[in-house]
């Protein structure tokens, strides 16, 4: 297919127009007085103030401009992936850096030296933000971060409560509910999505579950079908303590092994429940190993030279309580050694860092959460589907922002942290020439998020940014009340990870855009006009 090209200044200006189209759409949603963009697709419209959600929907007709829009979309997506929030701030900064940078390139500055200056300035500001950040572990601080992100006090308190229960590595998920309002469900310990093999193995018929108090836990990697394999261990369990229940986790339990369990359950000889191991292949092996670490068990596997008919009680794990329903199994308070559990957690974290696959990362994070802390489910309900989606979005953003805050700490919010941090650039970092100009580009661009937080409710943006620049660190403009003051005390705070990502990602794209000399796009094929109505009918005389 034929390609069409654009060069030099024309190419960069086309990219800038695309950047502006997307950024102008997104930036109306920054700040507490944000306007909301309605995105109509199939089905009901989506009402959102989430930058990345809006950015993903924007396609610009002109192919050159669309390249610029896609670059900013990449900024928003990357910021969302790293910090989970701050996507609108990142988009506003991308637009400002591109505008200031291109102005200087047009005036004859070297794009390569400008890029050098921009990169040095961003690194210095990022360092200053980290040095300023205040660590948070207070429940009230966590609630403030979440409430600010979701713009809802109740959400803030709920997320703080959830994080308090599951710890900072625990899973907090959001589910849609049929009721109105918000509710929090908590599962302590480890849960996996496999239930009992047979209804006959239930201990509580009314609640349709099996509850095992202080049970033995047998973890077997393969299938168990022959009773000859299982019997020696069952006899040892009965001799040791006939009243102690047994949970068997295996790839499957079938044939005479399963029927023997059922017969003994009915006779009341002993209480045993069998569940299938979760997952498949290597993931199943890893999850069984996680359970073993948590419960103090040893996984029975011929790969490591262990045969089921030759092992004793030493391979069994325990837990304070296990609840098995039709669909899932929850292990509460396993006595696994703390240092072994921590080593396993560190290993999974390293695997998360090293994987390129989103699916693998998600599954590893689930494993991490199951080991590191329980699982909290926030159930959200609303009157309409549109409102439900919007609330769910806000909740997910708030959870991400809260995780980021716990990880690296907080700085004052409302765009003020950047305004204060760029003071480290006042001597242009000792740079000269075009590199110094690159530093100045970052200094000018950094005030834009605060400017638009003020402009959206109709205030004079630059007047407010210059006032905030004269205040001390931590002080700023509270757009919700229209007052200046200590933002951290007022609960207007941002996770430093969000603020850093919202500056670093746009700077990287802006640097690329400034050094662009040629754009190559595919030429659209002209569609042939359809044949006229009756042209195929000839005249026959």
Swiss-Prot record:
Its EC number is 5.6.1.7. One of its GO terms (biological process) is protein refolding. It catalyses: ATP + H2O + a folded polypeptide = ADP + phosphate + an unfolded polypeptide. Pfam families: Cpn60_TCP1. GO terms for molecular function: ATP binding; ATP-dependent protein folding chaperone; isomerase activity; unfolded protein binding. It comes from the Bacteria. One of its GO terms (cellular component) is cytoplasm. Gene3D superfamilies: GroEL, GroEL-like equatorial domain, TCP-1-like chaperonin intermediate domain. It is found in: Cytoplasm. Its main location: cytoplasm. Keywords: ATP-binding, Chaperone, Cytoplasm, Isomerase, Nucleotide-binding. ATP binds at residues 29-32, 85-89, 414, 478-480, 494. Forms a cylinder of 14 subunits composed of two heptameric rings stacked back-to-back. Interacts with the co-chaperonin GroES. Together with its co-chaperonin GroES, plays an essential role in assisting protein folding. The GroEL-GroES system forms a nano-cage that allows encapsulation of the non-native substrate proteins and provides a physical environment optimized to promote and accelerate protein folding. Belongs to the chaperonin (HSP60) family. This is Chaperonin GroEL 1. It comes from Streptomyces lividans. The lineage of its organism: Bacteria, Bacillati, Actinomycetota, Actinomycetes, Kitasatosporales.
